[in-house]
Swiss-Prot record:
A GO MF label: exodeoxyribonuclease VII activity
Gene3D superfamilies linked: Exonuclease VII, small subunit
Protein name per UniProt: Exodeoxyribonuclease 7 small subunit
Keywords: Cytoplasm, Exonuclease, Hydrolase, Nuclease
Natural source organism: Pseudomonas aeruginosa (strain ATCC 15692 / DSM 22644 / CIP 104116 / JCM 14847 / LMG 12228 / 1C / PRS 101 / PAO1)
Family to which this protein belongs: Belongs to the XseB family.
Protein purpose: Bidirectionally degrades single-stranded DNA into large acid-insoluble oligonucleotides, which are then degraded further into small acid-soluble oligonucleotides.
HAMAP family, alphabetized: Exonuc_7_S (MF_00337)
Signal peptide: none
Length: 80
């Protein structure tokens, strides 16, 4: 089965969770563990990149003086 070059965030996270479970099981050989660890690092980086891009894209639209203006997303949830 051909794999897409990159997975979406949810697929990457699910695959990462599966890898962690396999590693924690203790049933993998050293080579299999190293391969799973390497793949886990790659997936972690992909997830971090996806989250970073999503955070940059998320903006709150505020209505001011009848016009829409964009305000950066406040991750803390502090609204004045």
């Amino acid at each position: 089965m051909a794999r897409k070059k990159t997975l979406d965030f949810e697929q990457s996270l699910t695959e990462l969770q599966t890898l962690v479970e396999r590693l924690e099981s203790g049933e993998l050989s050293l080579e299999e563990s190293l391969g799973a660890f390497e793949q886990g690092i790659r997936l972690t980086r992909e997830c971090q990149t996806s989250l970073s891009q999503a955070e940059q894209k998320v903006q709150i639209l505020l209505e001011r003086d009848g016009e829409l203006s964009e305000a950066p997303f406040d991750a803390e949830g502090d609204e004045a």
